[in-house]
Amino acid sequence: MAQSELNAANLALRLVGNRAVLTTLADATAEGYACTALIDDCKKSLLRMHPWNFAVKRKKIIPYQDVAVSDVTFVSANLIEVTHTATTYVAGNYVTLTGIAGATVANGTWEVASILSTTVTRLTTVDIPNIGTLGTYTAGTTDYIRRSPAFDYSYLYALPSDNIRILSINGDYDLDAYRIESGFILSDDSVLEVRYIYDVTDYTTMDPLFYQCLATYLAYNLCDHLTASDGKKNELHVYLYGGQGKRGIMPQAKFVDGSEDSLQQMGASEWVDSRGSGTGLM
């Protein structure tokens, strides 16, 4: 049977011992409601537990761009427009302006408020009153109240929108080199090369062992909603994590996945994760 969100839910129901077969996760049944409520959270939890190879993504984040004072138009006390080389900025990105000699107060980290064209971006910040000649404020433009970190680090980056877990930044696994706080990456580096676990939505790309673990983990959580049997829940716990002289499918899946990486490709924490037995639910 093809791997899909719906088929994973139906597999979980079979593991619970439920005879229902969902035709869609939107089925107006107790089984449909329970699966819809739980499956995405179960998937994200399992993705965070291990650096699964199928879920690793790389992204380069470059917030820096040199601009001249002639490229900057002051719109209001905390809003500017910048003309620049074409980029793929989107609202919510953070960018850093540097080298603006004639309006040094504009240098720093700003948040993208809106994209006016491929080469004109409207940026916003706070706590800079009267930074230049005020222009006409565009009604409806959203002002944000975030900017660079108050101390310790030079730059603040939004986490990738599909991030589940950061593995390394610029090849560094040392947390002193960066921090993850309030959904942002704090770093002194002006360019970030990020390796991270992303939120996999295409079930066909999932490792088959992970897919089996997901169905089992979902079944374990469904027990509280669909059955009063503690025995079934304990049985699924043993099947997933091991115990009672049995080896669970989760430790096996982690071991197989980890065996496909060399130590040179993995950080110390990833190596430990890949071989951890995972004896309890997280």
Q: Can you say where each PLM-predicted feature lies in the sequence?
A:
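Small/polar beta-strand repeat architecture
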Residues: 66-146
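Glycine-enriched, solvent-exposed interface loops adjoining structured elements
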Residues: 1-68, 141-282
